[in-house]
Amino acid sequence: MSLGLQCLAAVLFSALFSLGVILVHLPWRALKSKDPRERILGSPKELVPTCPYEYIRNIYGRHHWAPFVAKLAPNLKESDSDRYTMVLEIMDCIHLCLIMVDDITDDSDYRKGRPAAHIIYGRSETANRAYLRVSQIINKTTQDFPRLAPWVTQSLAEILEGQDISLVWRRDGLTSFPKAHDERVIAYRCMSSLKTGALFRLLGRLVLENRSMDDTLSQVGYYSQLQNDCKNVFSSEYAKAKGTLAEDLRNRELTYPIILALNEPEGFYIEKAFESGSPRDIQNAIGVIQSENVYRACLDELKQYESNVREWVTLWGRKEKLDLTH
């Protein structure tokens, strides 16, 4: 080997050796591609949840139904702490797992201003984890609190039936929806009583082990559904947290404001938006939904039901302003 080649080989060997020393002393994590969760949530210390369910529970808070339980049975925590904890675990699980799947169904990017669970963990893992957690909570309830198990399974069936009705309407548009306005409102209220009302009724049944609060909690559930529907199209704060305005319209959801807008003289814009999904038709439809007539009718409906369940509404603590109207 010539002197020149020997010198070149020596230089290359020295460079590779130096690089090896550097790599050995670098943290192994620095050599790995970044976890996609880290890009969204920040440093590794902030990446506490490795599970979609725990992630969404951190957003809402553990046992976030506790104020409702305290109102229904002020002494339950002291008199039967095991059942108290189990009720809260059941409510967390059913509510949050429904949210996880609902965000996938709606193709939502955000939940309460944070990335939706499926954006971080993927649709498959998020959906499967929701099914797993619900299965686990049903099994645990059956084994440890068998008297509560029928309430859980019956209410869950009602919730999913309501969700199924809503999804069929979304799939078929107006073809499977009643034609007359009054019938449409009735259909919406029935769907809401299943989809959301059953969740609130479940709480009362678990705490009291009877149906004595069904009527009241059904009204609380309807108010909650109605409030969410209205925030979706009338609240700038809610739109910011969700990352979009009128997500329900874009998903062809038949919500209360949209049903009212269909009955307006320019309601054909809603139908066009459902059919085409084009930005122009969506914008025209939003104009109809945010019209004074629809806005006032929604406020009247909210006030009517709030007057019956004001104490419960205060516990729910939803305060976004309905500030978007034409």
UniProtKB/Swiss-Prot annotation:
Binding site for dimethylallyl diphosphate: 111, 195
Binding of Mg(2+) 2, residues: 102, 106
Main location as per UniProt: membrane
Gene Ontology biological process: alcohol biosynthetic process; isoprenoid biosynthetic process; mycotoxin biosynthetic process
MF (Gene Ontology): metal ion binding; prenyltransferase activity
EC number(s) from the headed UniProt entry: 2.5.1.-
GO cellular component terms listed in the entry, alphabetical order: membrane
Keyword Repressor tagged: no
Gene3D superfamilies the record matches: Farnesyl Diphosphate Synthase
A Pfam family this chain is assigned to: polyprenyl_synt
Amino-acid positions noted as binding Mg(2+) 1 in the UniProt annotation, renumbered to this chain: 102, 106
Keyword Transmembrane helix: yes
InterPro entries in the cross-refs: Isoprenoid_synthase_dom_sf, Polyprenyl_synt
Topology versus the membrane: Single-pass membrane protein
UniProt keyword annotations, A-Z: Glycoprotein, Magnesium, Membrane, Metal-binding, Transferase, Transmembrane, Transmembrane helix
Membrane-spanning ranges: 8-28
Known pathway: Secondary metabolite biosynthesis
Signal peptide: none
Binding residues annotated for isopentenyl diphosphate, in chain numbering: 95
UniProt-annotated glycosylation sites, renumbered to this chain: 139, 210
Subcellular localization, as worded in the UniProt entry: Membrane
Function: Cytochrome P450 monooxygenase; part of the gene cluster that mediates the biosynthesis of the indole diterpenes nodulisporic acids (NA). Nodulisporic acid A (NAA) and its chemically modified derivatives are of particular significance because of their highly potent insecticidal activity against blood-feeding arthropods and lack of observable adverse effects on mammals, in particular the tremogenicity associated with the paspaline-derived IDTs is not observed.
Family (UniProt): Belongs to the FPP/GGPP synthase family.
Protein name per Swiss-Prot or TrEMBL: Prenyl transferase nodC
Lineage of source species: Eukaryota, Fungi, Dikarya, Ascomycota, Pezizomycotina
